[in-house]
Curated annotation (Swiss-Prot):
Entry EC no(s): 7.1.1.2
Organism from which the protein derives: Caenorhabditis elegans
Organism taxonomic ancestry: Eukaryota, Metazoa, Ecdysozoa, Nematoda, Chromadorea
GO cellular component terms listed in the entry, alphabetical order: mitochondrial inner membrane; respiratory chain complex I
Annotated PROSITE patterns: COMPLEX1_24K
GO MF annotation terms: 2 iron, 2 sulfur cluster binding; metal ion binding; NADH dehydrogenase (ubiquinone) activity
A GO BP annotation: mitochondrial electron transport, NADH to ubiquinone
Encoding gene, per UniProt annotation: nduv-2
Cofactor(s) this protein cannot do without: [2Fe-2S] cluster
Protein name, entry field: Probable NADH dehydrogenase [ubiquinone] flavoprotein 2, mitochondrial
Catalytic activity: a ubiquinone + NADH + 5 H(+)(in) = a ubiquinol + NAD(+) + 4 H(+)(out)
């Protein structure tokens, strides 16, 4: 195998690994595909153009580049994922170099630079969730949908990915589906959630255990006293 062929093979394998354990962000560089190239045009809808105006009105004169993340997010919500033509359109609107859009889109893993299903299932696979059964949750989804991490169902309804910490460790194991967190999961919960989504129903987000947010099971174990008011702990000279 030539050096060039070996490099291409390694890049391909790296891309597969990144997709499996990083969602649909892909490599940090763009590769033209049938659905993602400069010939595939992107324009914001008239409704979203009104939203863009409202977003940009938040930022002071000379600082509209600060709207880069909100506009990329809006483009992704309109298109379902973030193609390179959408990045170019955002850069054009904000009058910034295209590289600025690339930098943001490749840095934040919430931007999906490859197509994903209608429901993007992101299973947290880091230590707290793993210790609480994340592998079983992933296996349940794979068995239910007939796909593995990094794959999309044939009907385009679901994409599955294993991701890094989503910040809900106390509610492990958990998954993120689009914008919603589903926490304190069991395999039964996962099957019910997937059945609801398949049927067009919206399952209730949050803990499935019956607790509110991240409150402890049973009674409080800390913070039992009324917290002191402002100025507590200050040196006398500072009061």
């Amino acid at each position: 195998m030539s050096l060039a062929s070996n490099v291409l093979l390694q890049a391909s394998r790296l891309g597969e690994m990144v997709i499996k354990r990083g969602g649909a962000t892909g490599l940090m560089v763009h590769r033209d595909t049938k659905e993602n190239n400069l010939n595939v045009k992107f324009k914001f809808t008239s409704e979203n153009q009104e939203r863009i105006k409202a977003i940009m009105d938040i930022y002071p004169e000379g600082h509209k580049a600060g709207a880069l993340i909100p506009l990329l997010d809006l483009a992704q919500r309109q298109h379902g994922w973030l193609p390179i033509s959408a990045m170019h359109e955002v850069a054009k609107i904000l009058e910034v170099p295209r590289m600025r859009a690339y930098e943001v889109a490749t840095f934040y893993t919430m931007f999906n630079r490859q197509p994903v299903g209608k429901y993007f299932l992101q299973v947290c696979a880091t230590t707290p969730c793993m210790l609480r059964g994340a592998e079983t949750i992933t296996e349940t989804i794979e068995k239910k949908l007939g796909i593995h991490a990094g794959e999309t169902t044939k009907d385009g309804l679901f994409t599955l990915a294993e991701v890094e910490c989503l910040g809900a460790c106390v509610n492990a194991p958990m998954i993120q589906i689009n914008d919603d967190y589903f926490e304190d999961l069991t395999p039964k919960d996962v099957n019910e959630i997937l059945d609801d989504l398949k049927a067009g129903r919206k399952p209730a987000a949050g803990p499935r255990s019956g607790r509110l947010a991240a409150e402890p099971f049973g009674e409080l174990t800390s913070l039992k006293e009324t917290p002191p008011g402002p100025g507590f702990g200050l040196q006398a000279a500072l009061k």
